[in-house]
Amino acid sequence: MIKFLTSLPLMLTLMLWTIPAKAELLSVHADVPLSFSPTQEGADTPDSISGARVGLSLFILPLGIAYESYEVSYTSDSVDSKDTYQIASVFVNLPVPVINIALGAGAGMVTGEGELSNGTKLTADDSAATSFFATLGYPILPLFDVHAGYQVINANKVDVKDSSNVVRDENDPSGTVWTAGIKLGF
């Protein structure tokens, strides 16, 4: 028993020495959208996507929170429009060695507006949206990682109306987003 008690500190020291230390107490994530692909059949291809997703996670819990806001713009001969996505998410950082994996889900709203070529303003009803995303990151430095992400946004179809409240079209703002980002630990 005495041999065991005297060798216990040595064994614990060796075990702790081989386990990588996580020095970060808090990490901040920032992602930018690279592309957006609508899931609606026959939908126009977006001209641009802008915005960001920012998130915070604590070392104590593998959970984090994120907020994202994207603006997707479409231009055609007959109409210019944009959809604005605002989604709050919760994500979990998976304990995988060497790479950083995060899986998340969220909910929010999509608002749409547009203008016909003759100057008529269009508005779409607000659409409830859900979001699921995954990011895969690689640590470059001990407290810094770069990652790529894929996100699926499901939203309800909504009516697009003109200023006279006449339904002109139906819009499905659902789609997929590719993102790139960084994570900094503190």
Residue ranges, per PLM feature:
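Predominantly the C-terminal beta-signal and adjacent terminal strand-loop region
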Residues: 73, 132, 138-186
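Short glycine/proline- and aromatic-enriched beta-strand/turn motifs that initiate or cap beta-hairpins
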Residues: 21-77, 177-185
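Flexible, solvent-exposed loop segments that connect beta-strands
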Residues: 34-48, 67-86, 109-128, 155-174
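Cleavable N-terminal export/targeting peptides
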Residues: 1-27
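Repeated loop/turn-to-beta-strand initiation elements of outer-membrane beta-barrel proteins
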Residues: 26-28, 60-66, 98-103, 142-148
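Surface-exposed, polar helix/loop patches in the mature regions of secreted/periplasmic/lumenal proteins
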Residues: 92-138, 142-143
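Residues on the lipid-exposed face of transmembrane beta-strands in outer-membrane beta-barrel proteins
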Residues: 52-58, 90-96, 105-107, 134-138, ...
